[in-house]
Amino acid sequence: RVRAARFASGLALPARRITVNLAPADLPKEGSHYDLPIALGLMAGIGAIPSDCLAGFTVVGELGLDGSIAAVAGVLPAAIGANARGHGLICPAACGAEAAWASPEMEILAPLSLIQFANHVTGKQVLDRPDPRMRSASTALPDLRDVKGQETAKRALEVAAAGGHNLLYVGPPGAGKSMLAQRLPSILPPLTPAEMLDVSMIASVAGTIEDGALVDRRPFRAPHHSASMAAMVGGGMKAKPGEVSLSHHGVLFLDELPEFSPQVLDSLRQPLETGEVLIARAN
């Protein structure tokens, strides 16, 4: 992809073998977010861009075959980590808005393509710092006022919302258990700025942030009762956050609880007791 993107951008590589070293060698390296740093490193190495223009920057991004820079997951936590080290960030234009939330003083470059970045560092087309964006929910939450009767159950829901308690509803089909649970987010307090950042960082790692805009609504997750342990607590071949993490600062609704696998339910014990999810994987 790096070679094809450079060729499409009119930035041909020299006619000789080029070796790219990713250090430290003992750490596993996978994913498309290495495309952009490799390409920019090559451009600096052969003199296509000033060799010092990358100093003090963390770089993430995927390359298209036409030289465009595509979005990658995890840009927001990468930006926060880079800012903590005093670095700037070079990332895809589609991710610039979420990266801008890391710090108002942080230097962020979000080019659309390799050519646009080359024009920026040579002074031909200076890039503006991306502005942070907020995505307001397009639909209204189900309202607790819609529920008629069930005063005791509604009171329990209010107590759980006020104190951040877990809640178990038991009753016959049609009693309104699911309807009440789906209305819990409507009585929860708004996300604080710190909570909003936490929720958005998890969404960024999971690749569910839309247009780089932060989420301003508490998450509501309702996995099917056939969900696996990896889907619930996270993991998989390429480890990703599970439903427990995706519902952080929000609601994890397990409808038809007895239908869930006993192993899946038992996997929730540690997160409930410690307040964190730890995934151990070989290699």
Q: What are the functions of these language-model segments?
A:
Residues 88, 165, 248-251, 274-277:
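Loop/turn-to-beta-strand initiation segments
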Residues 125-159, 163, 191-244:
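P-loop NTPase nucleotide-binding/switch module
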Residues 168-212, 269, 274:
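Walker A/P-loop
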Residues 240-273:
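Conserved AAA+/SF3 P-loop NTPase catalytic/coupling segment centered on the Walker-B
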